[in-house]
From Swiss-Prot:
Keywords: Isomerase. NCBIfam families: PRK00702.1, rpiA. Pathway: Carbohydrate degradation; pentose phosphate pathway; D-ribose 5-phosphate from D-ribulose 5-phosphate (non-oxidative stage): step 1/1. InterPro entries: NagB/RpiA_transferase-like (IPR037171), Ribose5P_isomerase_typA_subgr (IPR020672), Ribose5P_isomerase_type_A (IPR004788). It comes from Sphingopyxis alaskensis (strain DSM 13593 / LMG 18877 / RB2256) (Sphingomonas alaskensis). Its EC number is 5.3.1.6. The active site is at residue 106. Pfam families: Rib_5-P_isom_A. This is Ribose-5-phosphate isomerase A. PANTHER family: RIBOSE-5-PHOSPHATE ISOMERASE. One of its GO terms (cellular component) is cytosol. It catalyses: aldehydo-D-ribose 5-phosphate = D-ribulose 5-phosphate.
Length: 228
């Protein structure tokens, strides 16, 4: 097991320690979030009583396989706690997410959550966002139009593919990966992208995150929004 893989697991275990009986828990998507689902499953085996909501079909399949009880988000208006990973996160609790292709459902679920914990290995904490391409979910009809608008913002844009064809999100949409190299003013970029017709969501998470748990070796650094 590589250091980064071990760190993901350690951070996940620490985050799942925050889950209490009776909670409705949001389950993120991606390799790091999968460790949280596995850790949650172990706690359920030892008597923890919770229900969960998945942010993707992939996470739903994993949760069902591990006997984590699920409810559909369509029946919900609020979530107690969501645990998820990030592709990049900075000291201001701003993150790029969507490498796993579930940014729209993640944004909805985390906006509905009383608390959001982001777990990550030490490589994900950055001084400035932007080295990881910014995912943008788009209506397929608007792909080339949105690509041109993103290019006008200075991005190098590619259509995400899987098996030689465009990757489809769980909603049947496309993802454009916008490489910007650096994003010194994330709110300006987020606002500009949001105004483009055909864009459904972008992967900048600027206000949703409450707690960051970054694993470094065998230790987990916990940071809370608003702390000095």
């Amino acid at each position: 097991m590589s250091n980064f893989v071990a760190e993901k697991s350690i951070a996940a275990v620490r985050a799942v320690d925050e889950v209490r009986d009776g909670m409705l828990v949001g389950l993120g998507t991606g390799s790091t979030a999968a460790y949280a689902v596995k850790s949650l499953s172990e706690r359920i085996k030892h008597g923890l009583r919770i229900t969960a909501v998945a942010t993707s079909q992939a996470t739903e399949a994993l949760a069902l396989r591990l006997a984590v009880p699920l409810v559909p988000f369509q029946q919900l208006s609020a979530v107690d706690l969501t645990i998820d990973g990030a592709d990049e996160i900075d000291d201001r609790f701003q993150a790029i997410k969507g490498g796993g292709g579930a940014l729209l459902r993640e944004k909805i679920t985390e906006s509905a959550s009383t608390r959001v914990i982001i777990i990550a290995d030490s490589s994900k904490l950055v001084a400035q966002l932007g080295k990881f391409p910014l995912p943008v979910e788009v209506v397929p009809f608007a792909t080339e139009f949105v690509r041109a608008r993103l290019s006008a913002l200075g991005a190098r844009v590619t259509v995400r593919e899987a098996g030689g064809t465009p990757f489809l999100t769980d909603q049947g949409n496309y993802i454009l990966d916008a490489a910007l190299d650096e994003i010194p003013r994330p709110r300006e970029i987020a606002a500009a992208i949001t105004t483009i017709p055909g864009v459904l969501e972008h992967g900048l998470f600027l206000d949703e995150i409450d707690t960051i748990m970054i694993a470094r070796g065998d230790m987990v650094e916990v940071r809370h929004r608003g702390e000095a």
